[in-house]
Structures are given as structure tokens and as C-alpha cells.
UniProtKB/Swiss-Prot annotation:
Main localisation: membrane
Transmembrane segments annotated in the record for this chain: 1-21
A Pfam family of this chain: TatA_B_E
Organism for this UniProt entry: Nitrosomonas europaea (strain ATCC 19718 / CIP 103999 / KCTC 2705 / NBRC 14298)
Role description: Part of the twin-arginine translocation (Tat) system that transports large folded proteins containing a characteristic twin-arginine motif in their signal peptide across membranes. Together with TatC, TatB is part of a receptor directly interacting with Tat signal peptides. TatB may form an oligomeric binding site that transiently accommodates folded Tat precursor proteins before their translocation.
Record protein name field: Sec-independent protein translocase protein TatB
Location relative to the cell: Cell inner membrane
Biased composition, class Polar residues, residue ranges: 71-93, 111-131
Amino acid sequence: MFDISFAELVVVGIVALIVIGPERLPAVARTAGYFLGRARRYVDQVKHDLHEEMELDSLRKLRDSMHETVNSFENSVRSEINKIQETTETQSAVIPDKQPPFEKAAENIEPVNTSETKTSSAPAEPRQPNS
């Protein structure tokens, strides 16, 4: 990280021992280690946040491209549906509605007048088939 060799660390340690003194050197070393650890965690957190933000940005771009694709597909499907509806509307306007055959037959049937029909009191007998 700082590119400090072992010899340079020994020189820094000897200077710190002379300047700070042997009584306060452990407390100063602990405090320095604590602040270096905090600084390292802070840098790691910033790196993590940047990496996460870059991933989110790429995911947003992917989402936007997917939305564009879905919208274009939806528009093409809607246009095809509209074409089909227009075609069926023009064809239904050209071809007149036909009545179903059973309704035509019902119109041609004349009502039977029950007063004119004869009823017989004798029971009906089956007819012999012709041979």
C-alpha cells in the first residue's frame, strides 16, 4: 500500500522510540493502528460502494434496454391486432348478416288451427308393412 520496506520500518520504529519514549510508545502504536484500520475500512467501503454503484448502473442500463424491447414488441403486437380488427370490420361490413337456417324455417311454418283438426275417439292401430 505505502511501498515501505522492512529497513524503512525499522528506522521509523527507532525514531519513534527516541522521540516518544518507551513508556508512551505502546499507546501511540495502538492508536496509530486503530486509525489505520479505520482508514482502511473506510477506503474498502468506498471501493465497495463504487463497485456496487457501477453494477447498479449496468443493471439500470439492462433494465432500460429490456423495457425498450418490451415496448417495441408490445407496439408491434398492438398494430397487428388493430390491422386484424380493421380487416374483420371491413369484411363484416361487406358480408350481410345471414339468418341461421332454423330461423328461416320457423318463419315459413304456418300456424296450425286447432279448431280444424279432427280428433277420433278410436285408438290408433299400427299398419301392416307392405311386402
